[in-house]
Amino acid sequence: MWKISNENDIFKKRKPLPPKKSEESQPELTPWQKQNQEYLKKQAEEAASKGENEQAEVTITLQEQSQEEPQQHLPQETVEEEEHFADRLPNVKKTRNKRLYRRLAFILTCLGTAILVALYFVSPLSRLSEVTVSGNKSVESQAIIQQSKLETGSGLWEQYSNRNYFSANIQKKFPIIKKANIKLNGINSFKIDIQEYQIVALAATKGGYHPILENGKTLAETTKAAESGKPIFENFKEDKLIPELMASYNKLPQEIKQGISEIKYAPSKTNKDLINVYMNDGNRVIVNISDLSEKMAYYSQVAEQMDKPGIVDMEVGIFSYPYEKESEETGSEVSEDSAVENQEVVDPNAGVATDEANNGTPTNGENQEVQQAE
């Protein structure tokens, strides 16, 4: 037989049943609503002391208010957030579409560029079609194109990237060319701009006249006739002398250059740097190559003080004298030299001497004795 325990023990051991869940779950309350409910509960507890009837009425009223107020008293921030999010939905879609369009445009641009570049290098436009020359005066255009080693029909950009090499070929072959600038001319053609050295003088040789450039180089080509207006350099057999002379000559004023007709190399025993500069006004200037640019600056002042053409000596100082004085000095020197050379040399072994005054008639010792007796 089972022993029935006390009713109180049975009720103590029985666990309380969990509250039944409402079919419709209530929305989560905000902190404001929770405080409101706590406030209502306090009022309900106070009203309970006054009477059950009043408590019931107050409870019913408060419950109705609590059910109506959650929607009426929602925080303004939550409502605004929902409104802002709804407003941003179209903007988000537009932003995404713009990004997609940009990426698509970038990809299409890259593909289109690659296709165009490939088509360009396959087409004849990427090959050199023509070469023209401008600025050349002394060298023919066809000779310049030929010596440049540029090839029509070959790659345009490959040759353009190596344009310095082709310019060097031209300058190496033609010393008169100072610069050869290769640049694009149109879609697939080149233009060579030539800048030449000026021919400032002529070097006189047995075969003719060689042009002398402003940088001191002497060209190998010869001309039979001298070009008017260009000074003539004579007796410059050493190659290094002309570049030294041109370094000083280029520093002269233009009016002095125009007044020079000829320059001769005239070294002395003691001075290997001496030259004679012949002027168009008839004067002759004696000066060192190294002093040419410095001392020739005073030539105009000295020439104005001269009464007639003569010599301007600038070897040591600066002074002038007429040609007659030089001829007298030269004549005296020549007479002294001729007297020394014409002295009779008697050979003791020679018995006969030739007298030019007697047309080669021999003179013996008997004639000498007759002359002595007379």
UniProtKB/Swiss-Prot annotation:
Segments on the Extracellular face: 125-374
Lipid bilayer topology: Single-pass type II membrane protein
Entry keyword Membrane: yes
InterPro entries in UniProt: Cell_div_FtsQ/DivIB_C, DivIB, FtsQ_DivIB, POTRA, POTRA_FtsQ_type
CC annotations in GO: cell division site; plasma membrane
Entry's Gene Ontology BP terms: FtsZ-dependent cytokinesis
Family annotation (PROSITE patterns): POTRA
Keywords, sorted A to Z: Cell cycle, Cell division, Cell membrane, Membrane, Transmembrane, Transmembrane helix
TM segment ranges: 104-124
Biased amino acid composition, Basic and acidic residues: 39-53
Compositionally biased tracts (Acidic residues): 326-339
Compartments where located: Cell membrane
Ranges for region Disordered: 1-90, 325-374
Family of this protein: Belongs to the FtsQ/DivIB family. DivIB subfamily.
Reported function: Cell division protein that may be involved in stabilizing or promoting the assembly of the division complex.
Name under which the protein is recorded: Cell division protein DivIB
Organism annotation: Enterococcus faecalis (strain ATCC 700802 / V583)
